[in-house]
């Protein structure tokens, strides 16, 4: 369940700190959130797709680690990001 290039470019443009920024923590979290949303919709239809479920859990764990890092390093950016992505603060 990969994102198409147009949607990916839109997300990168929205969350990038500067033009061409594809590796910042904010961009990575936003891309992971979009992939998680797509996989969640897929799993609502195909409930027995366990390999996709494991992939989803891996993505959720990766996003959790990145959010934890961002919360430690730049709390203002973290709080702005979770409000934009409608994520819960732990």
Swiss-Prot record:
One of the primary rRNA binding proteins, it binds directly to 16S rRNA where it helps nucleate assembly of the platform of the 30S subunit by binding and bridging several RNA helices of the 16S rRNA. SUPFAM superfamilies: S15/NS1 RNA-binding domain (SSF47060). GO terms for biological process: translation. This is Small ribosomal subunit protein uS15. Belongs to the universal ribosomal protein uS15 family. One of its GO terms (molecular function) is structural constituent of ribosome. InterPro entries: Ribosomal_uS15 (IPR000589), Ribosomal_uS15_bac-type (IPR005290), uS15_NS1_RNA-bd_sf (IPR009068). HAMAP family: Ribosomal_uS15_B. One of its GO terms (cellular component) is cytosolic small ribosomal subunit. It comes from the Bacteria. It comes from Campylobacter jejuni subsp. jejuni serotype O:2 (strain ATCC 700819 / NCTC 11168). Keywords: Ribonucleoprotein, Ribosomal protein, RNA-binding, rRNA-binding.
